[in-house]
Amino acid sequence: PTVWKAFDEWTAILAGDALLTLAFDVLARETTHRDPAIRIALVQAMARASGAAGMVGGQALDLMADKLGDPRTPTADHIRRLQAMKTGALLVYACEAGAILGHAPEAERKALVEFGTALGLAFQIADDLLDAEGDAATVGKAVAKDAAAGKATLVSLMGIPAARQMLAETEARANAALAPFSTKADILRAAARFVVARKS
């Protein structure tokens, strides 16, 4: 079960606050990297990914839609933006952090950010498809929740066939971003395949 189900909402909120604060503590430690410039870059990238321009901002957009009905008629662009911030930003960070730690050139860092962006979108589309057409026993959680709640997703907006097509195109875009790395990025290609093909 989720934390708020196992305990309660205030425990879940405080646990989230504590874990986010811990992330900055870990990144700032000398044991994370001996070069202070690298640690600063990691902290800055995490701040962007987790703050108003990332996870927290995306969650705010999601709550505005859920609780206030704003916007009244979400567009595909709005949903993509919300999902990129709420879910995708931390996946992008994981990719960018690797580039920072590896002293990657700017072009390679941008390529990994592009990969992470596509991976985040693919994850969300796949998740929405599982909710729309999966069965609870296989998925491992309740399904059809979005439709029951009247929540706008790319699947509800475009339909399942178009969402599947977008998922395939997004995986292709993720793989294209990895072209500069040749076979060294095969593990990332496998990660994208896993995200797209997962059944739970």
Language-model-derived ranges and their functions:
Residues 1-126, 132-176, 186-196:
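Mg2+-dependent prenyl diphosphate-binding active-site environment of isoprenoid biosynthetic enzymes
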